[in-house]
């Protein structure tokens, strides 16, 4: 396989804007990397879709995007899509694919109380994959889960400069705290890439004694490792954001995306 051209982009894919929480740390490690950020607004929210629907939708859409933008690597910057469709995507596409998995392993290493919370979408927290991660890396620990669709909507609103409903945060916190042993949680895994965008609000809700962790920096390091030795442009060029068309959800203003190095918006 020939090495990629310097202008071959990294493709980030999410249901919405949550993947920006992964793009940020990646930009820090690879500041001149060309970026295509794709958000499936026509399919948002993924957390309420069936496994079968996502297993068909995500590989098909990524296939179109790969054909159009010819990336050197694709990042599924979405826990729900990764836990359900990562294997299907890897089988369908002939390029490196980086997925997003709940950070249960580092949470298990960090907890002192032995009680870990996992906050994700409804689809992510019901996956057997999360059972497997818990069994492999958190044996002997209590792993409590809660699916919070409201946080996805809240994160999208937050990025647009809108106020986040405090009740959304309170319900997410209570969803873990009100379970048996929930009061002993000292580490919460943010198992949706949207949720770190609300880290300040969630930290206030859980209290300073609870550590909030996510996998974004680990994913960025993985991307840097997989592209080590490849050529990049000498200077950064503005990235492209691509949104699937949605009548009820127009793309955000470019000003929302500009801090992440995005310079233009397209729809497909």
Curated annotation (Swiss-Prot):
GO terms for biological process: cell wall organization; peptidoglycan biosynthetic process; regulation of cell shape. Keywords: Cell shape, Cell wall biogenesis/degradation, Isomerase, Peptidoglycan synthesis. Pfam families: Asp_Glu_race (PF01177). Signal peptide: none annotated. It catalyses: L-glutamate = D-glutamate. Pathway: Cell wall biogenesis; peptidoglycan biosynthesis. It comes from the Bacteria. Substrate binds at residues 14-15, 46-47, 79-80, 193-194. The keyword Calcium does not apply. Its EC number is 5.1.1.3. PANTHER family: GLUTAMATE RACEMASE. Provides the (R)-glutamate required for cell wall biosynthesis. Belongs to the aspartate/glutamate racemases family. This is Glutamate racemase.
């Amino acid at each position: 396989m020939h090495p990629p051209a310097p202008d071959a982009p990294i493709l980030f894919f999410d249901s919405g804007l949550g993947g920006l929480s992964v793009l940020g740390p990646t930009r820090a490690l690879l500041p001149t990397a060309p970026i295509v950020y794709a958000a499936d607004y026509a399919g948002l929210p993924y957390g309420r879709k069936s496994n079968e629907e996502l297993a068909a939708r995500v590989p098909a859409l990524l296939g179109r995007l790969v054909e159009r933008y010819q990336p050197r690597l694709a990042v599924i910057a979405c826990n729900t899509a990764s836990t359900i469709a990562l294997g299907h995507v890897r089988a369908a596409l002939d390029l490196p694919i980086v997925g997003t998995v709940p950070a249960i392993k580092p949470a298990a290493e960090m907890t002192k109380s032995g009680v870990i919370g996992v906050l994700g979408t409804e689809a992510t927290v019901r996956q057997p994959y999360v059972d497997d991660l818990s069994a492999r890396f958190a044996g002997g620990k209590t792993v409590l889960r809660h699916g919070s669709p409201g946080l996805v909507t809240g994160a999208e609103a937050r990025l647009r400069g809108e106020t986040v409903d405090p009740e959304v945060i309170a319900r997410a916190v209570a969803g873990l705290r009100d379970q048996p042993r929930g009061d002993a949680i000292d580490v919460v895994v943010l198992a949706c890439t949207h949720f770190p965008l609300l880290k300040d609000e969630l930290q206030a809700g859980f209290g300073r004694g609870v550590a909030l962790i996510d996998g974004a920096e680990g994913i960025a390091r993985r991307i840097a490792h997989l592209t080590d030795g490849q050529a990049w442009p000498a200077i950064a060029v503005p990235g492209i954001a691509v949104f699937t068309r949605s009548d009820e959800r127009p793309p955000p203003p470019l000003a929302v995306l500009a801090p992440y190095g995005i310079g233009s918006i397209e729809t497909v």
